[in-house]
Amino acid sequence: TFYRGIPKFHDIRTMFTIHNIQYQGQYGMEIAWDVLGIPEYQYPVLEYNGCLNMMKAAIMQVNVVNTVSPSYAMEIHDPWYSHGLDPILNAKGDRVIGILNGIDVEANNPATDEGIYQKYDVKTLEKKKVNKLELMKEMGLEPDENRMLIGMVSRLVDHKGLDLVRYIFHDIMGDNVSFVLLGSGDAEYEN
């Protein structure tokens, strides 16, 4: 996008996707020239709060900013969620959009999924409990169809709400509740 001023690139449109606004690519300004070879006249685009901020530069230079959902696109305009980039995003206005990402409903259809113990559909929901009981066995839990089983698949980082889960964990974990978590991420959660 630094080449937008060159006539042959004038009509090229660009988009930047934000998956997680917390990971902004922040470094000391000294690497702009020393490592990246970026000339000093372009520093104002790169610099934010005294450091090189690659996400800020990308947001400023692209035509459209995309996020993983419409609600996330709205959230990151708020100072609470933006990790300091709300003024830059707000300047983009309606050129910050969200396109919902999600699962492939054909590949993840419980009526045809070869990866589950018992196939089921909306008319045979009672078969679903076989999967619950088998998962409980696989996880070393006492199989009990009356026991609530909470499952969570996530990247194990604060941004995904693990700090909130940890905060309320003892309140939601009663005598008749089991919790299964699958993911990787920050060592404090993995351990």
Task: Show which residues each predicted segment covers.
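Catalytic cores of nucleotide-sugar-dependent glycosyltransferases that transfer UDP/GDP/TDP-activated
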Residues: 1-191
